Amino acid sequence: MRTEWIKKRMNDKTRTQMYYAKKGIITEEMEYVAKEENLDPELVRSEVARGRLIIPANINHKHLKPMAIGRVSKTKVNSNIGASALASDIEEEVRKLETSVKYGADTVMDLSAGAKNMDEIREAIIAASPVPIGTVPMYQIIDEIGDVLELTYDDILRVLEKQAKQGVSYFTIHAGLLLRHMPEIAKRKMGIVSRGGSLTASWMLKHHKENPFYTIFDDILDICKEYDVSLSLGDSLRPGCLYDASDKAQLEELKVLGELTLRAWDKDVQVMIEGPGHVPINEIERNVRLEQIYCHEAPFYVLGPLVLDIGAGYDHIGSAIGAAMAAWYGVSMLCYVTPKEHLGLPNEEDVREGMLAYKIAAHSADIARKIPGARDKDDEMSDARYKFDWKKQFELALDPERAKEYHDETLPQEVFKEAEFCSMCGPKFCSYKVTQDAMENFDWDEFKKEAEEKMKAEANN
C-alpha cells in the first residue's frame, strides 16, 4: 500500500509523520487515517503536529495499513504475542498474529524473549502483519549478549538499528527509570514488575551508573527519526499490585517520561506513554489526569489496568473493567491482558479471549465518548434482535463464531435460524414476541379516545 507514498519522499532529509505534520503537509498516511476515523485530514495533521495523535508507521513496513492512536480517534487495542525460551515457534507466533488481527488488534507487540531465532520470528510477523508491530528491544539485546551486566551503549544502538531496518513501528524504551528512584523502589511490596525495567535496574545497580537508555536517548532518537519509529516510553515503575499503585516511584518516573517526550518531539519523533498496571477503580481517573499533565497530552497506552489482584485465570475480565474506565477518562490505547496473565505464556485461544475482552472495553468507552458511528452496529443489533434476524445478529457480533456456537448448542437445526425465540425463553415467554403480539392487536385509536374522555372527565371534576 505505502510503497509509492514512501518512494515520493525518498530524498527528504526527515521522513517522520510528525515532521511533515509540523510543516503543514498532510501525508497519504494522514489521509488514510482521516478516512478510517471519519475525521477531517487537517485535524489529523494538527493533532500529529501537536503530539496528541501518533501514526506509528515505519518506512520499511510498506504493506502496513496506517492507524492512529490519540484522543480524537477511536480507542485502540494492542495484542502481545511472542516466543519464549520454553515455548512457541515461528508458525505459532504468526498464527497468534493472525488471530489478533482477526479479532480486532490495532497493533501487535512481538515480546519474544529467550527464543533462539528472534530475528526470523520478527521478520515473519512483520511480513504477515497489516498492523504496526512494536517491540521491547531490551529482550533481544540480552538474548544476544547473554548477560545484562555486560550491556554496552553500542549493544543498544545495534539492536535498535536492526529492528528499525526490519520494519518495527514502535519501540518500548525504559528510559525514565533513574538512579534517584531506587530508594522509593525499596518501599514497595512488589518492587519492579516490568521485565525491561528490572533488567535495566539490575545494570544500573551493578555499575552504579545512570540508565543507559536515558544516557544515550539522543542517539536512540536519531535511529527513530531515520526510520520513523515511534517511541512507547515504558513505565519501568508501573505498579504490579494494588498496594503499590500511584506511589511516589511511579509518579516520579512519569515526570521523567514527560521530559523525554519533549526531547523526542524536538527531533520530530512520535511518542506515546505507557501506563499501569494494577490500579484500584477509584484511582484510575487520577492516573490518567496526571499523565496528561506531566506528559503534555501525549497518547496514553495502558496495560489494563487490573482493578484487583486475586483474579488469576480471569485477569482478562478484571483488567477489562479497568480498561473501559481508563479509556473513558482519556487513555488512547489499551494493551490487552489474557486469562494466562501471571500464570504462563498465552496460546492462540488465550489471545482470542484477551482480544475480545478488550475490544468490548474499547468499544464501550467509544460509545460513552460519543465517537461518530461508534454505536451504529449496536443499534443495528437491537433491530436484528427485535426482528429475530439471527443471521444478522451473528454477523454483527464482535465474535460471530462464538455467538453462533452458543445459539446452536441447544437449537442447531437450520429451521431455528428463522425462529421467533431462543432456548432461554422458548416460544411462549419471549418478551420480544409477547410485546410484538400485544402491540399488533392493540387498538390505538380506541385507546386514544378513551384517554381523551378520561382527561375531560377529570377536568370537569
Curated annotation (Swiss-Prot):
Residues that coordinate or bind Zn(2+): H278, H342
UniProt-listed Enzyme Commission number(s): 4.1.99.17
Top-rank lineage group of the source organism: Bacteria
GO cellular component: cytosol
Cofactor(s) this protein cannot do without: [4Fe-4S] cluster
The keyword Iron-sulfur is annotated on this UniProt entry: yes
Amino-acid positions noted as binding substrate in the UniProt annotation, renumbered to this chain: N80, M109, Y139, H174, S194, R195, G196, D235, S236, L237, R238, E274, Y301
Pathway: Cofactor biosynthesis; thiamine diphosphate biosynthesis
NCBIfam families, A to Z: PRK09284.1, PRK13352.1, thiC
Protein name: Phosphomethylpyrimidine synthase
The species this protein was found in: Nautilia profundicola (strain ATCC BAA-1463 / DSM 18972 / AmH)
